[in-house]
Amino acid sequence: MKELILISGKGGTGKTSIIAALASLAENKVLCDADVDAADLHLVANPQVLSRAEFRSGHTAAIRKSKCSECGLCRELCRYSAIDADYHINPLDCEGCGVCVYFCPEKAVDFPENTCGEWFISDTRFGPMVHAQLGIAEENSGKLVTLVRQEARKLADEKKHDLILTDGPPGVGCPVIASIGGASAVLIVTEPSLSGIHDMQRVIELANHFKVPAMVCVNKFDLNPDLTAD
């Protein structure tokens, strides 16, 4: 099975348009949208959701006031100042480190897992697709990218398809690293601008670091023929 990941050093280069074009031509493939922070492949694929599941990751502490003795130990130990004078934990400040849970003498602090988003298996006009949506301001997008890629492989195995086309996230951060690890190849979509070239060079270095074969597609090539030639 081959897995081709389309990535770019910056947003707006047109990689979703390119992968939609490839999807319309390729056969026996599964589509995968790994840009979970700003998924948009569904805009051109017109998916009909067949199944959906919650994505859970990380924890946020919550104090049960009925058991809390207000001893102040949790407020003293919290390095993120997430606990106010009324012993209420601000979920925006809580980093989920768990120190309040561990040291609370009354065992009054719950530590539920966060629901960060959803992932989907859909049928599209191009064929089956696995995609996801991370919640607003939620973290751990790299873990969701990994989950989406794993589910795409399972779906390809079930349907006996030999190609996965993945729309990866832009940039060079954690989500991109999660999207290219172990891939057969990456196609870097860039544009003929100074920022486009600079960001392309960074993502090429990233692909080389993980020993993933890289190819380059210069989209909107006629914007600057000189830079395209370079």
Which residues does each PLM region occupy?
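Conserved catalytic-core segment of NTP-binding enzymes
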Residues: 106, 112-121, 143, 147-230
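Flexible beta-alpha connector loops of hexameric P-loop NTPases
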Residues: 133-142, 194
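Residue-level preference for the first positions of well-ordered beta-strands
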Residues: 3-5, 28-30, 162-165
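Walker A (P-loop) phosphate-binding motif
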Residues: 1-26
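P-loop NTPase switch/communication element
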Residues: 39-58, 121-123
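Short beta-strand-centered segment that lines the nucleotide-binding/catalytic pocket of NTP-utilizing
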Residues: 28-42, 113-118
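Iron-sulfur cluster-binding cysteine motifs and their immediate structural context
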Residues: 73-90, 99-115
